A protein has these predicted regions:
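Early extracytoplasmic/lumenal segment of secretory-pathway proteins
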Residues: 66-149
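Ligand-binding pocket segment of bilobal, Venus flytrap-like solute-binding proteins
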Residues: 148, 229-237, 241, 248-317
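Bacterial lipoprotein signal-peptidase II cleavage site
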Residues: 39-46
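Mature extracytoplasmic/periplasmic domains
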Residues: 331, 335-403
């Protein structure tokens, strides 16, 4: 996941990105030391179980949309019926400005606590800071592909769902009991996103949705040289190249497939002087980029925040593939093992899943959709939240399920393969 539209960083040069990757430890090679700091009993060297099942860096089975995983409880959840803790501070650990501060203030006032917001640069660095003891938050943003390490390292606490009735009441069944956390032992869902293509209709002449393979547009973008960009995310970028060639397993650890995807991506430097970055929510609406790989929420946020006055909403367009061919994902929230307010932490998770709170966070602040039963594309268009031409940016529960395509945890070897491939792509443009 990425930052709130008003806070995300600008385009990175390939050299800058490589430096950042080295500094923040994107590669999982450091996972062993991370987990060792959390639990001396945790081993991460083994990549297969005694039955031959693939294991993630945390030593737990790899979850997939068609392979449900129930995570082990490393301690019992808190008892039911306890009163919430009051007074002092309550710390939320998250991406910068990814949660509406007004809502945090209202929660604090309701329960008599001072809510503090501590930010991390990315989820990898956030988990490392938590493991080292550098921060001691109550709750934190979590992603399904990092859940393996957080649970194995005993960094997050098991949940007592008696305190979180909004999970079953308001949330899509597909995410109220997700495949990556069967029984919702450690997480509740927060926001959703899909990966597709955003473009300016007043500059890009092709009918992208009608193309036999819409991803081909990047390899046909000579006319948009210097105005074309991909996400600066290893998994997203390589997955796009895989999908373009019809390879639907975006969690593959086949070196031949990864190497071919990287070779294909390198072609884009000569074709369209491809850029990498995460400001498509701004650059496409403002017209400084005409063609971009993008998350679904980007164009909604861009329409709200960055479309210049007088520019019609129809200048923006977004495409995503059909289910099973479009990468979809969700962010989560978890309770940190460091919390001194476990009851209040449960109530905070329930608060995030309140219909009014989640909707306000979406339409008044970050532009990323929560998985609420009550949200439908038609209603958002009718209410003027989303223009009709961007209605396909809104996800439905039908986009998720066993036949969906989601970037999930890889083995440590697989993660290194993807990271090395992406570094090769970045270096391939001449540095």
């Amino acid at each position: 996941m990425t930052h709130h539209p008003k806070e995300r960083p600008g385009y990175l040069s390939r050299r800058d990105f490589l430096a950042r990757a080295a500094g923040t430890g994107f590669a999982i090679s450091g996972a062993g030391s991370l987990l060792a700091a959390c639990s001396s009993s945790t081993s991460v060297a083994q990549e297969t179980s005694t039955t031959g099942e693939l294991l993630g860096p945390g030593g737990l089975p790899l979850a997939r949309p068609d392979k449900r995983v129930t995570l082990p409880l490393w301690e019992d959840p808190i008892e039911s019926g306890l009163e919430p803790e009051t007074g002092g501070t309550f710390t939320v650990f998250n991406y910068p400005d990814y949660l509406y501060k007004k809502l945090l203030k209202e929660f604090g006032e309701k329960y008599g606590v001072d809510v503090q917001y501590t930010a991390f640069d990315n989820i990898t660095s956030g988990i490392k800071r938590l493991a080292s003891g550098a921060v001691q938050p109550d709750v934190m943003e979590m992603t399904p592909d990092n859940l393996d390490q957080a649970v194995a390292g005993k960094l997050i606490k098991p949940l007592n769902l008696d305190y979180i009735p909004n999970l079953q009441k308001n949330i899509w069944p597909e995410l109220a009991d997700p495949f990556y956390d069967g029984g919702s032992h450690y997480t509740v869902p927060y926001t959703l996103y899909a990966t597709g293509i955003a473009w300016r209709t007043d500059h890009v002449t092709e009918d992208i949705p009608s193309m036999e393979q819409p991803w081909d547009i990047f390899w046909q973008a000579e006319a948009y040289k210097g105005k074309t960009a991909l996400l600066s995310e290893p998994r997203e970028t390589i997955a796009m190249a895989l999908l373009r060639k019809g390879h639907l397993d975006i969690n593959t650890e086949d070196p031949a497939l990864i190497n071919q995807a990287v070779a294909d991506l390198k072609e884009l430097y000569d074709i369209c002087n491809i850029k990498v970055g995460d400001i498509q929510y701004q650059s496409v609406p403002e017209g400084t980029s005409w063609l971009n790989q993008a998350w679904a929420g980007d164009m909604i946020a861009g329409y709200i925040y960055y479309l210049p006055k007088g520019t019609p909403a129809t200048a923006l367009a977004y495409w995503k593939a059909d289910k099973g061919k479009v990468p979809v994902q969700n962010d989560c929230f978890s309770i940190c093992a460091t919390t001194k307010k476990p009851v209040l932490s449960h109530l905070f998770l329930n608060y995030l899943l309140d219909n009014g709170v989640a909707y306000s966070n979406f339409v008044n602040f970050n532009g990323y959709q929560p998985p609420l039963n009550e949200i439908e594309p038609e209603s958002l268009v009718k209410d003027g939240v989303v223009p009709e031409n961007l209605a396909n940016s809104v996800l439905t529960k039908d986009d998720f399920g066993p036949d969906s395509s989601q970037e999930m945890t890889l083995t440590a070897t697989g993660q290194q393969l993807w990271e090395d491939g992406y570094s090769d792509f970045l270096a391939g443009g001449g540095g």
